[in-house]
């Protein structure tokens, strides 16, 4: 077993610390000095499934392989769109990895 490609996907909407400071009693300096965070991506139209599928498609492209060549899909998230089918099985269907083993790991912070 090996990882042959990686991919990522972020929601389109970006909310900055200044955006937050405009609606609550805080500042960019206060947030960033305590957390290191300056911006965050907020999913408004995207779902966990759509983001995961886009990230997997990016990883497949990076690896130069087709979804049908995948043997195993493990999805790790506690914020799935639905309980059934699992996120991994939704990815499996989207990329055409019909013969792959697919399952989710839902372990929150302990994962």
Task: Label every model-predicted segment.
Residues 1-71, 93-96:
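Conserved "HGTGT" condensation-loop signature of ketosynthase/thiolase-family condensing enzymes
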Residues 4-7, 76, 106:
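Short beta-strand segments
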Residues 40-41, 101-103:
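Structural signal for short hydrophobic segments within the conserved structured cores
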Residues 45, 103-111:
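Active-site nucleophile and cofactor-binding loops and adjacent substrate-binding regions
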Residues 53, 85, 109:
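Glycine-rich phosphate-binding loop at the start of an alpha helix
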Residues 71-77:
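Short glycine-rich or small-residue beta-strand-to-loop segments that form or flank ligand, phosphate
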Residues 79-92:
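Short Gly/Thr/Asp-enriched flexible loops that form oxyanion-binding sites at enzyme active sites
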Residues 82-84, 98-102:
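Short, flexible active-site-proximal loops enriched in glycine and acidic residues
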